[in-house]
């Protein structure tokens, strides 16, 4: 079940459920600013506002660059709709027409709890991206246009997940959240696109990704490095017992007891 796979990803991100704004409810995430400095509309005084192609292209370039740099290619797409505003059949028709997507692999009715605690009827559409031809930039452009001249149904309603897990959520032309199961998973994105991080959240994000990590104690023997005691003990045992046997008073089991702190389980000279 794709819905179950999606929920497992959400749990892996440290959340019980999707809760907006996603960045504020996830332990590890980065919020990027997508819209650039160009004006959104060509002429704000016109009777009918016309979207500025340069603004749209700039936002698309940023969103697509981050998408291509994700830890892996997303393998699951979820798009939410709200049947109280538009019937589910009509929603799906619009989604398929604008995106060129096939019939979803799963369609699930649900109840959404919003930020104010109010409930809303919802329908969730799921696609297994590994089995279809998918044009991510077409989807990203539709989301970007949602609030500035496109179809608003894509705004804050599209989620892409992949192994890790991670979640990619372009919510509109202004911003994008990328959530991860660990800071190590998102560290390459943090470094590569640090200049695009939303300034309002920059200090908070920097604290997460630059915090000192506890250093693992390392051991070296015969030029080999070990990051855990078990591997180190195994190598010590190999080096110090090489060529010895119980006949000359060195029993490997007894030596292993002493080495690992478990004295008294074997006697020296006891055959192996």
Give residue spans per PLM region:
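Extended, low-hydrophobicity segments enriched in charged/polar residues
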Residues: 1-150
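Glycine-rich, often proline-containing surface loops adjacent to acidic residues and nearby aromatics
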Residues: 38-47, 74-78, 120-122, 169-177, ...
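Short, intrinsically disordered, mixed-charge
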Residues: 65, 69-72, 145, 195-198, ...
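Short, surface-exposed beta-strand/loop "edge" segments at domain boundaries and coil↔beta transitions
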Residues: 85-89, 133-135, 167-169, 184-189, ...
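Acidic (Asp/Glu-rich) sequence patches and key acidic residues
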Residues: 107-114, 119-123, 127, 227-237, ...
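A short, acidic, amphipathic alpha-helical segment used as a generic capping/interface helix at domain edges
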Residues: 150-164, 254-263
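Alpha-helical oligomerization segments
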Residues: 159-211
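N-terminal intrinsically disordered, low-complexity segments enriched in P/E/S/T
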Residues: 211-246, 250, 254, 262-272
